[in-house]
Amino acid sequence: LFHSVTASAADTWSVNPSDYRYDMSLYLNVTFAAGEELDYTQYDVAAFVGDECRGVAEVLPVPGGKDCLYLRARSNRESGETMTFRYRNKTTGEVKDIENVNFAFASNARLGYPSSPYEVKIVIYHDVIISTEGGGSVNESGGRLAEGTSLNLIATPDEGHYFSGWSDGSTENPRPLVVGTEDVAL
């Protein structure tokens, strides 16, 4: 299991509002796919077009409710630009894309409400490498899989060969595997 990280030290997380003609309001609740809330005191969230920052979210206290993020996205096109999200660890500076989540910019539009924010799920993906040595096959090919994905690996030796174990020393076959946060090579 290998973890892929998308990060760029060159990301600029500021926007000059006078550089843009149009804006859009977003009210967001950002969580990890497993249900854990993103700690807004530890992370920034921003909207991007390519590598250009188009808005940085601020924490919006909601009376009697859970805080959400308010983000004012900006554009010079009235509509149609596809914007993506990134989040940044305030302590380490590490930046990651929020993969497979985007929105179409529309001037004066709103996405979500303070009382019902738009849900943004951070799904962490890992490159899962499954290979064979000698003669045989494995029923799963691996690939880029979401954290928490369950696999049931079955090693099938070719005629004249036998299964001796996985590269981590386990001899369980079939072998259940849940894609986690630690690197594992099988």
Task: Name the predicted role of every residue range.
Residues 1-3:
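Bacterial N-terminal signal peptides
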Residues 5-125:
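Primarily marks secretory-pathway-exposed extracellular/lumenal segments that are disulfide-
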Residues 45, 85, 130, 136-138, ...:
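Extracellular/surface recognition and adhesion modules
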Residues 58, 74, 141-143, 175-177:
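Beta-strand-rich interaction surfaces with strong enrichment in secreted/lumenal proteins
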Residues 80-82, 148-150, 183:
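Extracellular Ig-like/FN3 beta-sandwich strand-entry sites
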Residues 91, 149-176:
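Surface-exposed interfaces of beta-sheet-rich extracellular modules
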Residues 127-144, 169-172:
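Short, solvent-exposed loop/edge segments of extracellular or virion-exposed proteins
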Residues 146-147, 175-186:
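Solvent-exposed segments in extracellular or luminal domains encompassing
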